[in-house]
């Protein structure tokens, strides 16, 4: 079977796989009609944004729909700014836009790769802020009814790197737009790492934005130079008792207390202290500067990346008794599959 359309330019790992057909959509109406037609035909379909959260382990025996819809509309009331953003907008460019419009609140989420439409699926987050904190609503195409529907943020069932779009709406919904709600009474979020040195009374949104960009640029390789999907593993959440046991054996372990009493561990710290920072397996490697990032060292296949990920998971579990979970979607011949390729 021939797969004439290369996916290499459309996944940030730079994996060389192809697909049967590819369609680019530039309007919401086009996105609706294209996805409904493919869904009703029962042929494999993959809706692709920035390709920054995906690992292709095989050619895709179906149609890839590239979402290139654009548009940002702004409104306000006495207490909030509201942004309605089309799914194909670049996330980081949206953060930049909001700052330039004097609508702060997104600065902690700077330089997260991908599109706005992908952001709610895994409830993107960084430096103490998650999408759920500023999401107002999510509009999506219901593939079964053909209707455009809207969920409030509460209805999206957001959790750490989770949402309803990874649950009961998985493979049944295509996100078309996202609404954001930014308080006019801006409060800096400075709890995490490199932001703690700022003075909450004097810091500006622009300073936070620039610091986040600086830190992410130092730690995360440019996908054009070294293929990657950003953070490959979720930060595992453990009970307070488990954390205390780990801290007794590993006093420098990094953990962040959660509102429910659990503790979120830094997966990068676990990987590094399992001796895997800079480790390579074939053409895939653990990044030498940030152990949370897996990289394509040149001509790596999706299988290479998955094998490395499984090795990292096994080693961290062996050393710490903690099981890591992968963040990116793993795509096989006909759709999403598991890491065990």
Curated annotation (Swiss-Prot):
The protein's name: UDP-N-acetylenolpyruvoylglucosamine reductase
Similarity comment text for this entry: Belongs to the MurB family.
Pfam families, per database record: FAD_binding_4 (PF01565), MurB_C (PF02873)
InterPro entries reported for this sequence: FAD-bd_PCMH, FAD-bd_PCMH-like_sf, FAD-bd_PCMH_sub1, FAD-bd_PCMH_sub2, MurB, MurB_C, MurB_C_sf, Oxid_FAD_bind_N
GO BP field: cell division; cell wall organization; peptidoglycan biosynthetic process; regulation of cell shape
TM spans (from-to): none
Pathway the protein takes part in: Cell wall biogenesis; peptidoglycan biosynthesis
Superkingdom classification of source: Bacteria
One cellular-component annotation, GO: cytosol
Keyword Calcium: no
Residues of the FAD-binding PCMH-type domain: 13-185
Molecular-function GO term, any one: UDP-N-acetylmuramate dehydrogenase activity
Active site: 161, 231, 327
Source species of the chain: Shewanella sp. (strain MR-4)
Keyword Ribosomal protein applies: no
Keywords associated with the record: Cell cycle, Cell division, Cell shape, Cell wall biogenesis/degradation, Cytoplasm, FAD, Flavoprotein, NADP, Oxidoreductase, Peptidoglycan synthesis
EC number: 1.3.1.98
Top EC class for this record: oxidoreductase
Biological role: Cell wall formation.
Location within or outside the cell: Cytoplasm
PANTHER family (UniProt xref): UDP-N-ACETYLENOLPYRUVOYLGLUCOSAMINE REDUCTASE
Location (main, coarse): cytoplasm
Catalysis: reaction(s): UDP-N-acetyl-alpha-D-muramate + NADP(+) = UDP-N-acetyl-3-O-(1-carboxyvinyl)-alpha-D-glucosamine + NADPH + H(+)
Cofactor: FAD
């Amino acid at each position: 079977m021939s797969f004439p359309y290369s996916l290499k330019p459309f996944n940030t790992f730079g994996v060389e796989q192809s697909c049967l057909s590819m369609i680019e959509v530039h309007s919401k109406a086009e996105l609706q009609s294209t996805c409904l037609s493919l869904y009703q035909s029962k042929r494999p379909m993959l809706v692709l944004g920035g390709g920054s959260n995906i690992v292709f382990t095989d050619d895709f025996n179906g149609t890839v729909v590239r979402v290139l819809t654009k548009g940002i509309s702004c409104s306000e009331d006495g207490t909030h700014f509201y942004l309605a953003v089309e799914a194909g907008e670049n996330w980081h460019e949206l953060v930049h836009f909001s700052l330039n419009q004097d609508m702060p609140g997104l600065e902690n989420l700077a330089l997260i790769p991908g599109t706005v439409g992908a952001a709610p699926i895994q409830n993107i987050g960084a430096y103490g802020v998650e999408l759920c904190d500023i999401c107002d609503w999510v509009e999506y195409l219901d593939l079964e009814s053909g209707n455009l529907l809207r969920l409030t943020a509460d209805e999206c069932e957001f959790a750490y790197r989770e949402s309803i779009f990874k649950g009961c709406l998985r493979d049944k919904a295509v996100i078309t737009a996202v609404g954001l709600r930014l308080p006019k009474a801006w409060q800096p979020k400075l709890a995490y790492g490199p932001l703690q040195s700022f003075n909450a009374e004097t810091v500006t949104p622009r300073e936070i934005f620039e610091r986040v960009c600086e830190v992410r640029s130092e730690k995360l390789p440019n996908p054009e130079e070294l293929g990657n999907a950003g953070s490959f593993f979720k930060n595992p959440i453990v009970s307070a008792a488990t954390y205390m046991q780990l801290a007794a054996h590993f006093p420098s372990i990094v953990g962040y207390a959660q509102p429910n009493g659990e503790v979120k561990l830094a997966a990068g710290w676990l990987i590094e202290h399992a001796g895997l920072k800079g480790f390579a397996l074939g053409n895939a490697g653990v990044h030498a500067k940030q152990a949370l990032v897996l990289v394509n060292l040149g001509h790596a296949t999706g299988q290479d990346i998955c094998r490395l990920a499984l090795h990292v998971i096994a080693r961290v579990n062996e050393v710490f008794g903690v099981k890591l979970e992968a963040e990116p979607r793993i795509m096989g011949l006909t759709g999403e599959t598991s890491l065990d390729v």
